[in-house]
């Protein structure tokens, strides 16, 4: 069976030796298969490879058939989110990090020769990961890449003081909250910051988002799962003279003031992730979270 994907991009984590070594191994393997290979600019600098084709993330998204991201979940998160802004290029994750929720292929010879080989031949399963976009005070001029989240959008305390929020969903008043903040998470992000704050785990294929309070000053405040078609408006109240921080996937921090409004809704773009044919999301949860393990 011929390869389904012929032009393959490799993206690694900058300044990480073990990732660079894996990139070189991966490059050699793909070259043996007769595939055309392009390496992301910063990734190529960290390797000993010479006379290789290089490109930016935008160029990769527009020119390549598939992108392989080598590293941890953070590197996968950053690269796949940016690639999705420019095209529907599918992404494969090879884990050279710690947890590996998103980078589901192992970084070993067996995974290359069997799992990756099969995926590149087209024998794979697909997950479509939804993203969120936000704007502050209806500002539509913010750069798109600074407004899109694959995991979560969080509003958190900046000075060790709790602050107040007023939340509307689809134009209807939902609740007030005082505490350390609020996380609005995608299904992908439900196993990240949102889970640490006590939120539920959502299947990546579920068309939902979850609102998770952070250390709410009320026993009645609970996580809320809603449709991902909903529009969420969050107003900062003047309680405690707040200066909370708006973070998008842990980056692009913006200091907010009282009476400002943050609007969050589903982004039009999705991240397309390729897995092995027998990939089971619940296997990943069981392995990474230690389900069914004997504790004592």
Curated annotation (Swiss-Prot):
Pfam families: NAD_kinase, NAD_kinase_C
Source organism phylogeny: Bacteria, Pseudomonadati, Pseudomonadota, Gammaproteobacteria, Thiotrichales
PANTHER family: NAD KINASE
Reaction(s) catalysed by this chain's protein: NAD(+) + ATP = ADP + NADP(+) + H(+)
Protein source organism: Francisella tularensis subsp. novicida (strain U112)
Alphabetical keyword list: ATP-binding, Cytoplasm, Kinase, NAD, NADP, Nucleotide-binding, Transferase
Name used for this protein in its record: NAD kinase
Chain's role: Involved in the regulation of the intracellular balance of NAD and NADP, and is a key enzyme in the biosynthesis of NADP. Catalyzes specifically the phosphorylation on 2'-hydroxyl of the adenosine moiety of NAD to yield NADP.
Molecular function GO terms recorded: ATP binding; metal ion binding; NAD binding; NAD+ kinase activity
SUPFAM superfamilies, alphabetized: NAD kinase/diacylglycerol kinase-like
